Amino acid sequence: MARALIYTCPSPGHAFPPVATALALRDRGHEVTIRTTSASVEAIERLGLSAAPIDPRIEAIPLEDWKARTSIGALRSACETFERRAHHEIPDLQRAIEAERPDLIWVDSNAAGAATAAEASGLPWAHYMPYPHPLPARGVPSFGPGWAPSEGLPSRLRDGGLDAFKKVLFRPFVRDLNSHRAALGLPALGSLDDLPVIAPLLIHFSAEPFEYRREWPRNVRSVGPALWEPEGAEPEWLAAEERPIVLVTASTEFQDDAKLIRCALEAFAGRPYAVVATSAAHDPADFDVPANARVERYLPHRPILGRAAAVISHGGMGTTQKALAAGVPVCAVPFMRDQLEVARRVEQCGGGTLLSPRRLRPDRLRAAVEEAIECRGGAERVRDAFQHAGGAEAAASALESLVAVKRQPTEV
């Protein structure tokens, strides 16, 4: 039996991805503790897992990348936030290690400070990544803008140029992170590209064909999407709803995407669909809701997906992959963060359509959703591939292997 310590960043969409694997580890006889957002602790404890909040000073540093004017500007803003959090994550994880005495540490890939502390601990440790893998590779577009893959020379020059620019742009973040690493006796990073490969193991919550085919880094184990969500009662109105459902989602972390819900409500008002929107960071009372629609802050998506004709997604990895894992096509309207990359993958894998928020209009959104509905076959192919990726059990086995390697006796 081993003790596993899981550490998440404060983003709402990053708290639940490791939960299914934590349950798998527990069911194999291991002790599991999760340090996560204060809002998630109760839901995790109800599962019989040990949980505690991360340092509140970390949660008090919000992502403000939604204010950026470009995708690269948003990435830079996010890195600045990660660096500010790192000052608190390092001692926070060190205290957790002292309290829990783990045999294994599993860290959110967006918690760069916690990862630094995990590496310096000398214990077996791993990353988890709940978004598209950002590392450059041949045939894979430079991460950020959501460009389509292409093997042509112009695209290779474009991608190489942007990758070189990002190395310069993110140099201050790498420099600051290296100061933390030096204080802990760790070697310096050469660039931001070192972060995804520095852990002995990275559990990637995705899989081909949603992900672009590529030569994967040796530390990556792609296990398919993280589908766990808190149990919720099936909405009482769902059983009586006979119309095909269009599910609309907004980001759980504020990014000013309420216009997507407003546009969807207008696009399908009076149409033969039931529109169900989860507003998350937005107040449901702020929307004018037509007779064939409802807006609630949160609803369990799983039972609704079982009845959905399509999902209108903001391009968040969690909602998008839950839809595709259910074989439901997606119309992705990305705003920022990894959403541009997620939305392009929806289009490229044949699981739905992509509509730029700059072109967002009721008639265009309706046309894009109707086109997405015709992509159910592609969504089902992605669903089948996800089911064969191994899921939480594969992730648990990979994590167990780290501890097994550490415990092997040294040959004399």
Predicted regions located by residue number:
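Conserved nucleotide-sugar phosphate-binding/catalytic loop shared by glycosyltransferases and other
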Residues: 34-78
